[in-house]
Amino acid sequence: MVSATPPAPADGRRVALLTLGCARNEVDSEELAARLHSDGWQVTTDGEGADVVVVNTCGFVEKAKQDSIQTLLAAAETGAKVVAAGCMAERYGRELAESLPEAQAVLSFDDYPDISDRLGAVLAGTAIDAHTPRDRRELLPLTPVRRGEAAVSLPGHGTPAAVAQPGARSAPIEVDEHTPAHLRPVLRRRLDTGPVASLKLASGCDRRCAFCAIPAFRGAFVSRPPEALLAEAEWLARTGVRELVLVSENSSSYGKDLGDPRALEKLLPQLAAVDGIVRVRASYLQPAETRPGLVEAIATTPGVAPYFDLSFQHSSEAVLRRMRRFGSTDRFLELLGSIRALSPEAGARSNFIVGFPGETRADVAELVRFLEEARLDAIGVFDYSDEDGTEAAGLSGKVTTATVKRRYDRLSALADELCAQRAEQRLGSTVQVLVDSVDGGVVEGRAAHQAPEVDGSTTLVAPVGGGVDLTALRPGDLVECTVTATEGVDLVAVPDAMISAAPGVAR
């Protein structure tokens, strides 16, 4: 088995990678870890004792930006050199550098191929000029199928050929004589030893949602080749990963720039067939692009979780039009109905924005109707706020702050109630639970409808009589269980049978 955490060089410079935001950022950090480790750096996720702390920031909404700034300031208090990377750094560049002198450098995605040189310069006291932000959509051809030819840094795309700029050093993962040739280009070093890992399908987005700034700093949509994804999936499995979570800004678009708009339907069974992988989970699906064939592939392919992370954002047709999105309550309910016709117990989650400019009480009532009929397992509610550089910031019909808060509080309370009710509907059902952790006799895992960190979890309790010995379970085991109780969105279940034991684990 390839080690997830190969020993660090004894005399290496020490760098801490702190990751904020989404799972896509986590993949980017693991690419940086691979580059740095191969160049002699000791890589850690603990800022204490580090020579340099790199904060992979999030810049999606105001709260995320504030969290990023606070993390950078806290890192500076350790006495280490501090470097800002990631989305907030890319989005604000020179402006962030001027407003945050505590950071010795603010890096662009274009700096990633030379990350070791950049951090070396920081340690040497050399000033690094921050970049002037630009719309990264303009760096790639307008025609999707020509984007693979462009020499643009795409974080998390996993192979030196995909991300290295002319003259930049490529930095593959540590390999040995037992590493198959097709795995040697994988550019990733795990920072987590758990049984689940994200696999980045693509970067960027071609949609123009009025509230979202992501395409401007992440760029246009670019898919990774299937062969690169399959190689990385195999490499991850060799490090002990059992579940792959497919991430991107819009997974439904995967393959459109490869000349195959149905590429995801073909990729899913191939990923599920990778030795050692017991669950593949798709995420970040765009409802308008979630076609019948994709629904069928996710709902019925063995080894693929029947799980639908659908970005609805609202259900009022009028609000969706102002958001530059498509859909309505009835169309979204029809989509959910088609999913459950194929997989009655399929999981479904979504996020919603309340208080978008022009939203009326009737629009809120329409959203409430949708939520009450949709039977979603997890619901995220966000209160609207203007974001720099977005179309929505200039729209008329702004909802007052007090009204936004009232609507947010109401919808959040409703979401909690509805998700708890949905969990109760699973009482007595059989679920497949992947064990994530065993700590002091407490065994935690997730059923197929529960994605890591965002959708709740399942606690396993000792069976009465037969079943699986709870004390013998280990992270990475896949167990068939019966749901016996709920706690909000979380489940309590009894393990009935081992489906697939984690390989190479002492028992």
From Swiss-Prot:
Top-rank lineage group of the source organism: Bacteria
Subcellular location: Cytoplasm
Xref: Gene3D superfamilies: Methylthiotransferase, N-terminal domain (3.40.50.12160), Nucleic acid-binding proteins (2.40.50.140), tm_1862 like domain (3.80.30.20)
Details of cofactor binding: Binds 2 [4Fe-4S] clusters. One cluster is coordinated with 3 cysteines and an exchangeable S-adenosyl-L-methionine.
Iron as UniProt keyword: yes
PROSITE patterns: MTTASE_N, MTTASE_RADICAL, RADICAL_SAM
HAMAP family, A to Z: MTTase_RimO
UniProt similarity note: Belongs to the methylthiotransferase family. RimO subfamily.
Name listed for the protein in its UniProt record: Ribosomal protein uS12 methylthiotransferase RimO
